[in-house]
């Protein structure tokens, strides 16, 4: 059942933490709370979220992503966890299976950011896709599982004065959502400045 928007430009965000151990209560999930905190700081336009905590099972991941986009009506879905080379890491495969358009630039940029910190970032297989239905479309992106890495990939790298050195991936998300017919997203510029061409900017 689709969620009711309280405002025409309210962004519906799906947050999915994918972990065998967290989903069975072995340890507490950190990915979704980190994302909730980040969006609370970063977005100035209205938004609401739908969260899920599921195991590393490809069919379950696919069903969850489809539910969030097709049934709930999310405009943006972010996953955390399950993107490494281990046998149980199947989040990218599930994401690609439900997508209608691959968006490789997001994964490429995430790895470029993370490689500034750890050489093992090259082992990460994060992907992003657009999922389209006859009357709706959404951007689905895989993120790292650690809160620090989540923030770094979304915001990018800044120098001591706060000037951007390497853009974070979220800078491109608002315009991407524009292009697929979603709500107009506005951000707190000192956290993450949204980039749009001048022709796509709304008058203040």
Regions found by a protein language model. Give the residues of each.
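Non-catalytic beta/alpha edge segments that cap or flank active sites
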Residues: 1-204
């Amino acid at each position: 059942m689709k969620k009711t928007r309280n405002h025409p430009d309210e962004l519906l965000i799906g947050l999915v933490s994918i972990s065998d151990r967290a989903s069975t209560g072995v340890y507490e999930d950190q990915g979704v709370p980190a994302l909730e905190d980040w969006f609370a700081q970063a977005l100035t336009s209205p938004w609401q979220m739908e969260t899920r905590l599921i195991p590393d099972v490809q069919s379950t991941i696919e069903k969850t992503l489809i539910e969030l986009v097709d049934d709930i009506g999310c405009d943006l879905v972010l996953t955390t966890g399950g993107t490494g080379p281990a046998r149980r890491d199947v989040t990218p495969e599930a994401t690609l299976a439900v997508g209608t358009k691959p968006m490789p630039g997001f994964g490429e940029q995430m790895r470029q950011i993370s490689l500034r910190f750890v050489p093992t970032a090259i082992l990460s297989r994060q992907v992003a896709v657009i999922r389209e239905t006859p009357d709706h479309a959404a951007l689905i992106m895989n993120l790292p599982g650690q809160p620090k890495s989540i923030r770094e990939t979304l915001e990018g790298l800044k120098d001591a004065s706060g000037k951007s050195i390497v853009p974070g991936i979220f800078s491109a998300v608002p315009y991407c959502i524009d292009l697929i017919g979603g709500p107009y997203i506005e951000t707190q510029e000192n956290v993450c400045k949204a980039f749009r061409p001048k022709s796509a900017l709304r008058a203040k």
